Amino acid sequence: MCVTYHNGTGYCKCPEGFLGEYCQHRDPCEKNRCQNGGTCVAQAMLGKATCRCASGFTGEDCQYSTSHPCFVSRPCLNGGTCHMLSRDTYECTCQVGFTGKECQWTDACLSHPCANGSTCTTVANQFSCKCLTGFTGQKCETDVNECDIPGHCQHGGTCLNLPGSYQCQCLQGFTGQYCDSLYVPCAPSPCVNGGTCRQTGDFTFECNCLPETVRRGTELWERDREVWNGKEHDEN
């Protein structure tokens, strides 16, 4: 509503819930969010508000008591920042180089002592490494030689130790991760690009290839049907 003075000037008298020279802002204090007796102070030009807290309270909405541990005991050590989660609980954000619930420990993992993809955790200023399968040692620096334990490779296969793992080299006629399967040349087919596999012996095969157009440089040429003589191969 516009109110006019005798001299011709006037102002806008805003209805409840609106503020500003032209009542263009909603009153941010309409729903008073300030707790514990706090007073809402509107910033009309910005449509925002702040809480002026009663004695003994703090926080954006005056929701925390100044007797909160973050204020009284200051539990976060070594420059850590205390975050109030509720009236009496908190969480510390630690400075780089420190860890622990209250940032009380030096972060022993900062130097990345754990090797080979292992996980580092700090406990009481010391690090502990959780190793991936295939590695051992305080820092997971030692490769486990799986081939020291017999029986990994079946049917006379030879065990080859690899970093963090091992591989079985199979005798003729066997295949699979543990040399536990009979080798059938065309099952599954090794031929690619639509080629057809034909078994030519106990351990040999050939691929009958489809006619294929191949680009070499700027020229196109047609490759006729050809036969590739395959030999036994190790799938591993």
Curated annotation (Swiss-Prot):
Going by the UniProt annotation, this protein carries glycans at N7
InterPro entries listed in its UniProt record: EGF-like_Ca-bd_dom (IPR001881), EGF-like_dom (IPR000742), EGF-type_Asp/Asn_hydroxyl_site (IPR000152), EGF_Ca-bd_CS (IPR018097), NOTCH1_EGF-like (IPR049883), Notch_signaling (IPR050906)
Question: Which top-rank group of organisms is this from?
Answer: Eukaryota
Q: Cite the PROSITE patterns for this sequence.
A: ASX_HYDROXYL (PS00010), EGF_1 (PS00022), EGF_2 (PS01186), EGF_3 (PS50026), EGF_CA (PS01187)
Recorded GO MF terms? calcium ion binding; Notch binding
Q: How does it assemble?
A: Interacts with ELANE. Interacts with NOTCH2. Interacts with DLL1; the interaction is direct.
Q: What is the protein's major site of localization?
A: secreted
Q: What is the lineage of its organism?
A: Eukaryota, Metazoa, Chordata, Craniata, Vertebrata
Give the family from UniProt: Belongs to the NOTCH family.
Cysteine disulfide links:
C14-C23, C29-C40, C34-C51, C53-C62, C70-C82, C76-C92, C94-C103, C109-C120, C114-C129, C131-C140, C147-C159, C153-C168, C170-C179, C186-C197, C191-C207
What this protein is called in its record is Notch homolog 2 N-terminal-like protein A
Q: What does the PTM comment state?
A: Cleaved by ELANE.
Protein location? Secreted; Cytoplasm
**UniProt tissue specificity:** Widely expressed with higher levels in leukocytes and lymph nodes. Expressed in radial glia neural stem cells during cortical development.
State the organism named in the record: Homo sapiens
